[in-house]
């Protein structure tokens, strides 16, 4: 399964949407590397690339939330921590195996892609709506 950015994932915040597209691209690069090479080193390097960008993106989102005094920021951070744990678990899977297995790919699909879709459609969209509503009320 490849991750796809479609209209259902648009939050209306250009920065967030652009970063989500990049995040999805990095997830797909990880999946592609698992298909084209069963090499453990390649998988670890590609997972590093995804993990680094995820940290950058989470930092940007959390800074945005702080700047708009988003009331559910702590809950949002806990959701980010869930994906951090998933990424750590993926590293552990790679450590225990010779390379990316079918089970590894299944975990990326289930615990990264599905998590990301739910997170964007719920948490991130609510942040973008809150920001938009605050900006709209300030103009009145």
Short names for language-model regions:
Residues 1-140:
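Small-residue-biased structural context
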């Amino acid at each position: 399964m490849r991750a796809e950015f479609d209209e259902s994932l648009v939050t209306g915040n250009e920065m967030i949407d652009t970063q989500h597209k990049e995040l999805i691209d990095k997830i797909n690069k990880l999946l592609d590397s698992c298909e084209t090479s069963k090499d453990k080193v390649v998988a670890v390097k590609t997972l590093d690339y995804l993990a680094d960008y995820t940290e950058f993106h989470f930092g940007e989102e959390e800074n945005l939330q702080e700047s708009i005094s988003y009331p559910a920021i702590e809950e949002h951070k806990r959701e980010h921590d869930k994906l951090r744990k998933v990424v750590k678990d993926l590293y552990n899977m790679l450590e225990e195996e010779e390379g990316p297995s079918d089970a590894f790919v299944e975990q990326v699909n289930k615990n990264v892609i599905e998590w990301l879709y739910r997170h964007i459609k719920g948490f991130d969209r609510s942040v973008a709506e809150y920001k938009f509503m605050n900006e709209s009320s300030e103009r009145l």
